[in-house]
C-alpha cells in the first residue's frame, strides 16, 4: 500500500489506525489534514482501491482508519463517506479501586477487591484504552473518594501519601454513602500486592494518561467529599471536617499537586457530598435543610486551586465539572463566579437506571432553569445489568436522539455497583478478560451510535456476523432475538421504578434496606404499590388497576399494556432462538451469548406475568372479584417457574458476587423459594373495598 501524507504525519493515534488495516485491499491511501471538517469527524473518498481520508485532527484520522479496517476485514468495498460526531465527548464512568486504604464508592464488592492490582498494571490499561478507542469513546472519568494519597506527594503535606498497593483480608463494610469504608480491622489485615513508592505511582499514572492521549482519550478525575482516606495518623491534623482550615488547605494544595504532576489531566469533577453538611435527599430544591456551605467548600478548595494554578500557567487547559447532586444550579454558578472560575455542570440523566425510558424527564426542570448559554455533561448510570449481555441498538438510538445534544458538552456512562475492570463474574472467564470485552456488544452500541448516530441495523448485523463467524442470515436472527430479549427489563423498570441502584436491581428483583442492612426480594405486594418512572409516559400498576376497575382509560401507557409488551418481546425472542441452532458450535462466546438471551427471555417472562398478577390483585382488593384473584394466582405460579428457569441459567454461568451497592453476595437461586410466597400472598389476600 502506498501511503501519502498531506499536512500531517504518522502520530501514535494514526499509527494505531494504520496497524488495523489488512495487508490487501488498498492500493493508495491518502491522509489529508483539512481544518474545515468537524472535530473528530472525517470525509472519505473512494475510487476503487484508492482511498482519500480528510480529517481535521488525529482522532478523525484514527476513527476513519478503524472504520476502513473493519469494512475491509469484513469484505465490504469502501464507499464515499462523511461522519460528523453526533456527541463531541463520549465517556466512560469508571469507579477506580486504587487501594484498600483509599476506597472508591464501589469498593465494598468482589469486583473492586479483585481489580485493585489490575489498576496498577499497564497491560490492563493498554487493553482498556485500546478498546475505548476502537469503540469511539474519547473521555475516561476516574471516580474515587480520596484521590491524593495514592497519586501524588503534596509538597505542603509530604507525609499524607501512601506507598505500595494493598488489599485487606477483612472486607469493606457496605455503605451507600462512602462513609466508614476503611476501618481499623482492615488496617490490621493489609496485604501488599505491589511494591511501589509514591513517586513510582505518580509516574505510572503519567504513563496511563500518555497512552490515553495516544488514543485521543482525555482523562478526568472525579471525587466525592469530604473523604480523607489514606491520611490516617497524619501529623497535620487532616480530618473529614469540611470547616477545618487544615483540611481545606490539604484539598487546595492536593488539587494543585494533581495539576502539576499530571500535565495531561483534562479536569476534575466535584460532588457536594456524600460526607458533608447536607445529607438529605438529592432533591435539594425541595429540602429545607439545604445550605450553601458544601458548595463553598468546593469553591475555596478545588475551585480556587484550579483558578490560581491557571493564573500561573496560562497555557494549561483544565476543566472543573460540578455535579448537580446535592447542589443547586444557580448556587453553583454564583459561588464559583466569586473566584472567578469557569465551570461545567453535570446532571445525572436517568438517575441510576439508563435502561428504562428513552426520554427521561428528570432533567426537564434543569433545562428550563439553566441559562441559555450553559453547557453541561450528562452522567449516564449503567447499573441494571452486571451479568447479562444487553444488546438493543433501537433503544440506544432512541435514547441518544432524545438527549439535549445541542446543550451538551458530552456524557460519561458507567456503574456505581461494579468495576469495569477484569471480569470475575463468568464461570468460564478463564484468564479474566476485560469486563467490556464480555459486554462487547453493549460497549460498541453506545460508543458507535454516540459517534455516528446514523449506523443502520444492517451494520450491527454485520458486526454480529463478524464477531461470531456466522452467516449474515443467522446474525440477523440473533440480532432480532437479542434486541427483543433486552427490551423486557427496560420496560419493566419503567413500570417498577426506584431512583437508585440499591433500591432496584433488576437481575435479582431485589433491593438493599440501608437502615436494616438487609437484602429484600420484591414480592408481588410491593409491585402493587410501586410507582412508575417519574414524569414518564408509563402508568403504575395501581393506576392501571384503578382505571380498569372504573372502566376508564389511563392517560399514560397502562401497566397492562406494558406487561403485554414485555411478554411479546420475550415470546418473540424465544421463538427466534427456537429456530436458531447453535448446538454444534465450537464458539464458546456464542453459546454463552445465547444463554444470556435465554436468561433475558425467562426474566422478562417473570416480570411480565408478575406485573399482570399485581394488577389483578389490586383489582381484587378493590372489588373482591375472585376471578381477578384466580388469574393472579395462575400468573404467579407460572412466574415462579420462569424465575427458577432463569436462576438455573444464571447459576450455571455466573458466580455469585458481593455487589457493593447492595452490600451482600447476590445468588439469585436464593430467591427461588421466595417466589412461591407470591402465590401464598395472592391466596391469602383479603379485599378492601374501601380502596374503591
Task: State what each model feature region is.
Residues 415-420, 429-672:
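C-terminal non-catalytic alpha-helical accessory regions
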Residues 18-33:
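Short acidic low-complexity segments
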Residues 1-13, 35-41, 45-247, 263-264, ...:
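Feature activates predominantly on carbohydrate-active enzymes
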Amino acid at each position: 500500500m502506498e501511503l501519502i501524507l498531506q499536512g500531517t504525519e504518522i502520530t501514535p493515534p494514526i499509527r494505531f489506525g494504520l496497524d488495523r488495516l489488512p495487508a490487501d485491499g488498498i492500493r493508495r491511501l491518502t491522509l489529508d489534514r483539512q481544518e474545515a471538517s468537524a472535530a473528530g469527524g472525517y470525509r472519505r473518498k473512494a475510487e476503487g482501491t484508492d482511498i482519500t481520508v480528510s480529517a481535521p485532527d488525529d482522532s478523525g484520522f484514527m476513527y476513519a482508519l478503524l472504520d476502513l479496517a473493519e469494512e475491509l476485514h469484513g469484505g465490504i468495498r469502501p464507499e464515499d463517506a462523511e461522519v460528523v460526531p453526533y456527541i463531541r465527548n463520549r465517556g466512560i464512568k469508571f469507579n477506580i479501586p486504587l487501594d484498600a486504604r483509599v476506597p472508591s464508592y464501589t469498593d465494598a464488592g468482589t469486583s473492586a477487591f479483585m481489580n485493585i492490582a489490575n489498576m496498577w498494571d499497564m497491560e490492563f490499561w493498554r487493553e482498556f484504552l485500546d478498546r475505548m478507542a476502537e469503540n469511539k469513546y474519547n473521555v475516561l472519568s476516574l471516580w474515587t473518594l480520596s484521590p491524593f494519597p495514592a497519586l501524588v506527594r503534596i509538597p505542603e503535606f509530604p507525609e499524607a501519601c501512601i506507598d505500595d498497593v494493598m488489599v485487606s483480608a477483612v472486607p469493606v463494610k457496605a455503605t451507600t454513602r462512602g462513609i466508614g469504608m476503611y476501618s481499623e480491622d482492615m488496617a490490621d489485615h493489609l496485604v501488599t500486592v505491589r511494591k511501589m513508592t509514591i513517586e513510582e505511582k505518580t509516574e505510572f499514572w503519567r504513563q496511563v494518561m500518555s497512552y490515553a492521549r495516544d488514543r485521543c482519550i482525555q482523562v478526568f478525575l472525579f471525587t466525592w467529599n469530604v473523604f480523607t482516606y489514606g491520611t490516617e495518623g497524619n501529623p497535620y491534623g487532616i480530618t473529614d471536617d469540611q470547616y477545618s482550615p487544615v483540611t481545606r488547605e490539604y484539598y487546595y494544595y492536593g488539587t494543585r499537586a494533581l495539576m502539576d504532576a499530571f500535565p495531561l489531566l483534562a479536569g476534575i469533577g466535584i460532588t457536594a457530598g456524600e460526607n458533608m453538611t447536607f445529607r438529605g435527599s438529592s432533591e435539594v430544591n425541595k429540602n429545607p435543610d439545604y445550605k450553601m456551605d458544601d458548595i463553598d467548600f468546593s469553591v475555596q478548595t478545588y475551585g480556587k486551586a484550579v483558578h490560581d494554578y491557571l493564573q500561573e500557567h496560562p497555557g494549561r487547559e483544565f476543566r472543573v465539572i460540578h455535579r448537580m447532586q446535592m447542589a443547586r444550579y444557580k448556587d453553583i454558578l454564583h459561588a464559583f463566579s466569586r473566584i472567578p472560575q469557569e465551570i461545567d455542570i453535570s446532571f445525572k440523566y436517568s438517575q441510576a437506571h439508563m435502561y428504562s425510558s428513552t426520554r427521561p424527564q428528570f432533567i426537564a426542570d434543569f433545562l428550563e432553569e439553566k441559562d441559555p448559554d450553559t453547557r453541561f455533561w450528562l452522567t449516564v448510570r449503567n447499573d441494571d445489568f452486571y451479568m447479562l449481555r444487553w444488546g438493543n441498538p433501537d433503544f440506544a438510538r432512541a435514547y441518544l436522539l432524545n438527549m439535549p445534544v445541542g446543550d451538551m458538552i458530552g456524557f460519561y456512562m458507567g456503574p456505581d455497583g461494579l468495576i469495569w475492570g477484569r471480569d470475575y463474574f463468568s464461570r468460564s472467564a478463564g484468564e479474566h478478560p476485560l469486563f467490556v470485552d464480555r459486554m462487547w456488544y453493549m460497549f460498541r452500541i453506545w460508543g458507535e451510535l454516540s459517534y455516528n448516530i446514523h449506523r443502520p441495523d444492517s451494520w450491527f448485523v454485520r458486526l454480529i456476523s463478524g464477531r461470531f463467524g456466522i452467516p449474515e442470515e443467522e446474525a440477523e436472527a440473533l440480532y432480532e432475538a437479542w434486541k427483543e430479549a433486552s427490551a423486557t427489563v427496560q420496560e419493566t423498570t419503567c413500570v417498577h421504578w426506584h431512583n437508585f441502584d440499591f433500591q432496584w436491581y433488576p437481575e435479582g428483583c431485589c433491593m438493599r434496606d440501608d437502615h436494616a442492612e438487609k437484602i429484600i426480594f420484591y414480592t408481588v405486594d410491593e409491585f402493587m404499590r410501586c410507582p412508575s418512572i417519574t414524569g414518564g409516559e408509563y402508568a403504575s400498576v395501581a393506576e392501571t388497576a384503578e382505571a380498569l376497575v372504573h372502566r376508564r382509560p389511563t392517560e399514560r401507557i397502562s401497566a397492562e399494556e406494558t406487561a403485554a409488551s414485555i411478554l411479546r418481546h420475550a415470546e418473540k425472542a424465544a421463538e427466534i432462538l427456537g429456530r436458531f441452532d447453535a448446538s454444534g458450535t465450537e464458539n464458546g462466546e456464542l453459546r454463552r451469548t445465547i444463554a444470556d438471551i435465554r436468561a433475558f427471555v425467562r426474566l422478562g417472562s417473570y416480570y411480565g406475568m408478575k406485573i399482570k398478577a399485581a394488577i389483578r390483585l389490586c383489582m381484587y382488593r378493590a372489588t373482591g372479584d375472585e376471578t381477578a384473584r384466580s388469574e393472579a394466582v395462575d400468573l404467579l405460579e407460572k412466574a415462579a417457574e420462569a424465575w427458577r428457569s432463569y436462576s438455573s441459567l444464571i447459576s450455571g454461568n455466573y458466580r455469585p458476587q458481593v455487589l457493593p451497592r447492595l452490600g451482600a453476595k447476590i445468588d439469585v437461586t436464593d430467591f427461588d423459594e421466595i417466589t412461591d410466597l407470591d402465590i401464598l400472598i395472592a391466596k391469602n389476600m383479603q379485599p378492601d373495598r374501601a380502596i374503591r
